[in-house]
Amino acid sequence: MGRVKLEIKRIENTTNRQVTFSKRRNGLIKKAYELSILCDIDIALLMFSPSDRLSLFSGKTRIEDVFSRYINLSDQERENALVFPDQSRRPDFQSKEYLLRTLQQLKAENDIALQLTNPTAINSDVEELEHEVYKLQQQLLMAEEELRKYEPDPIRFTTMEEYETCEKQLMDTLTRVNQRREHILSQDQLSSYEASALQQQQSMGGPFGNDVVGGWLTENGPNEAHLFDASAHSAMYETLLQGSSSSSNQNNIMGESNVSNHNGDMFQEWAQAYNSTTAHNPSTLFPPMQHQHGLVVDPNIEEIEIPVMKKDAQADHEVSDYDIRMPQLSSQ
């Protein structure tokens, strides 16, 4: 019995459909290979399996080249090249339109690929970049040549002039480096001096110390003139009293104590009167002071005359007092 002829229609079973494709694919590829060898033709075979796996075959020419030849054909040639097993069957118009759109897309992609691979289609930006790279390479070579001057190779020198020139360049460079170093050191010292001066000025509270004096005197305060208290006045005038008493004792020829005691009583009365006056109204002696041009100025200052006896008048008074008291003492 012969083989049963398989009806040409779609196989419904998925497994059977995949098995049938695998068997007939190998036979189709074998026939295409034999045809390309025997007839020396360009052939391209493109297949997708039921599981969407791609299968390709091409002869001695790449499949891309075969498709390019097909894309470059005219529409009339493409239409005449369509071959159908059943001659009574006509091509579907919608399938033809879809195929044409696909072919036009492939042709556009092919044109882009040819334009990119064409040496004459180099972009101007690429030329500018190449020119910039060339310039940078030249600058790099020049910089390397300049650096070689600071690390000379004695083997390359052949004359004394070259040695002297190299020595002069190195000495000039060393001089510039030292000058730059001194400049930086001077700038650092100046900045440190300014910082210390500013810190000292801030610690003093002002350039002339006015803040220190201003701390003593409260502006418009009631006690701004009380620089010294009553005890300080008493101590000061007690010292003056002692000094006056000692000077009067030196001027006294007889050296008796009653004369010095008499003078002491006079000064004590005067000191007590002064202390009582300053205790009641101390501001009369030291009125409010003002600052003018960094100095302390008292606008109400007046000259005060202190009643101090001259030495000659004081001596005459003491002698007369002595003459009066001597008869009294002798009578006692």
UniProtKB/Swiss-Prot annotation:
Task of the protein: Probable transcription factor that forms a heterodimer with the MADS-box protein AGL30 and is involved in the regulation of pollen maturation at the late stages of pollen development and pollen tube growth.
Disulfide bond sites: none
Keyword Transcription regulation applies: yes
Disruption phenotype: No visible phenotype under normal growth conditions. Pollen grains from the double mutant agl66 and agl104 have severely reduced viability, delayed germination and aberrant pollen tube growth.
Transcription is among the record's keywords: yes
Tissue expression pattern: Expressed in pollen.
SUPFAM superfamilies per record: SRF-like
InterPro entries tied to this protein: MADS-box/MEF2_TF (IPR050142), MEF2-like_N (IPR033896), TF_MADSbox (IPR002100), TF_MADSbox_sf (IPR036879)
Record organism: Arabidopsis thaliana (Mouse-ear cress)
Pfam families associated with the record: SRF-TF
Keywords, sorted A to Z: Coiled coil, DNA-binding, Nucleus, Transcription, Transcription regulation
Protein's gene: AGL66
Subunit structure: Forms a heterodimer with AGL30.
Listed SMART domains: MADS
Domain MADS-box: 1-61
GO biological process, one term: regulation of DNA-templated transcription
Chief location of this protein within or outside the cell: nucleus
Protein name: Agamous-like MADS-box protein AGL66
